[in-house]
């Protein structure tokens, strides 16, 4: 999905900032594990709440957990297990970009999500 044809970084950033919700959903895609790739014949699918993902990059590399929240405004997901400890002892979920995770197990409660496999 092309948001803009410009090469200018400022216009690329502006296109991401002003992107409609259906385009943001597509941009929130993460790669699938090997067995899911074979099963669905797709390399990547949008991340949804309830999916189990493995973090591949960053401080929390190697952690596997369930997606508890997907933030379409900031293009981030929140994974259980990737937490920051605050000064007062509380824990807060750490935001992670979906390009840095791999979907290991998908939440199959939504039938519309798998309608592409009928084609």
Curated annotation (Swiss-Prot):
An individual GO BP term: translation
Alphabetically ordered keywords of this record: Ribonucleoprotein, Ribosomal protein, RNA-binding, rRNA-binding
Entry function: One of two assembly initiator proteins, it binds directly to the 5'-end of the 23S rRNA, where it nucleates assembly of the 50S subunit. Located at the polypeptide exit tunnel on the outside of the subunit.
Protein name, per record: Large ribosomal subunit protein uL24
MF terms (GO), sorted A to Z: rRNA binding; structural constituent of ribosome
Organism: Methanococcus aeolicus (strain ATCC BAA-1280 / DSM 17508 / OCM 812 / Nankai-3)
Stated family: Belongs to the universal ribosomal protein uL24 family.
Assembly and interaction partners: Part of the 50S ribosomal subunit.
One cellular component (GO) term of this entry: large ribosomal subunit
Disulfide bonds listed in the record: none
Gene name of this polypeptide: rpl24
């Amino acid at each position: 999905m092309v948001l803009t044809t410009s090469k200018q970084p400022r216009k690329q950033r502006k296109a991401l900032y002003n992107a409609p919700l259906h385009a943001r959903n597509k941009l929130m895609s993460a790669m699938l594990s090997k067995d899911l790739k074979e099963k669905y014949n797709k390399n990547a699918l949008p991340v949804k709440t309830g999916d189990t993902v493995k973090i591949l990059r960053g401080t929390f590399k190697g952690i596997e957990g369930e997606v508890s929240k997907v933030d379409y405004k900031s293009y981030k997901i929140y994974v259980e297990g990737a937490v920051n400890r605050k000064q007062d002892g509380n824990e807060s979920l750490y935001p992670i970009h979906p390009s840095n995770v791999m979907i290991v197990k998908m939440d199959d409660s939504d039938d519309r999500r798998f309608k592409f496999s009928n084609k």
